[in-house]
Amino acid sequence: PITSRCLECHVTYAEGSGGDTLEPVNFSRDKIIYGVSCEKCHGPAAKHVEYQTGNPAVKTAKYVINPAKLSRQQQLDVCAVCHAGKMQKIKPSFQFVPGKNLADYFILDSVHNSSLAGGEVEVHGNQYGLLRKSKCFTATSTMTCSSCHNTHENQRGEAA
């Protein structure tokens, strides 16, 4: 079955019916933002879109999160919400937004770390955990996922 945890990574937002339960079973099809859009990394954008639409000459983004301006851990959390392997939810689905601390919403599963099959990272593996254990990461205090990956470009099949 497709769970709210699946949707948290494969759609930008989905509203569960029946209130804010930890694991809603039903979702309103008309209240799903399909795909992974800007809001997944930049947070809710209604106020941003309204402002920019009314002020097209303003080139500085307002009312939207710039992940590059977040702390290192908050930047990592933006990616880890979908790339940290199994996590136990402690708050309802779709409550985490960029700039918040992931540990307030999920408990990372340190027991089931990502397995390497033939040298490849499993799709639902713990890329976050692998990064944190890498020599590159531990040698610096500034490395984040975006040090090697550009989320604004399709980089499928490319080595980091």
Protein language model regions, located:
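Primarily the internal scaffold of c-type cytochrome electron-transfer domains
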Residues: P1, E15-A160
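Parallel beta-helix/beta-solenoid
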Residues: I2-Y13
